[in-house]
Amino acid sequence: MKFLIDGMLGKLSRWLRIIGFDTKYLNNAIDDELIRIAFLENRILLTSDVELYRMAVAKGVDAFLIKGKTNFEKLAYLAKRFNIDLKVDENNSRCPVCGSKIKLVTKNKVKNKVPESTFKNYEKFWVCLNEECKKIYWHGSHWKRINEVLNKANTLKNSLSLEGSVENDKQ
């Protein structure tokens, strides 16, 4: 599954990348461009814009209207619709910044590229494979918060119903 996210859902793109989905985020694209790219690249268009959603569906593009105000609510609705297990898969995670694949590297590969205390305190490091990005990741203090949000979203997902909601209105 590949996603295309409009400008109103930028944070959602980061979450989807973290859990391993090929996610393109275009924050300044006009509606017609989003629809065209979603169609050409066979991506599911995610939006919170009802008008964009309806235009995409009318043009035969697979689209989903995201509900929710918080990250965990948005993730829960998306996970319910596409039967996504909201957990980090370290083998498939992508760079939350650019969307490229990340790779587990030996600790020595990041020496002098991360703060000394980080190098001393952590054993596992991942590097973005995009030559222009090359961000380095590790299980820092944010790791607990990431898992808390994903767990909360999974719990909410199990109590949701999509019946009769506008995202299922394909007319």
Question: Predicted segment positions?
Answer:
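Short linker/helix segments within small regulatory modules
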Residues: 112-125
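Short metal-coordination and nucleic-acid-contact micro-motifs, chiefly zinc-binding Cys/His arrays
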Residues: 88-92, 121-124
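Short cysteine-rich clusters marking metal-coordination/redox-active sites
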Residues: 95-98, 128-130
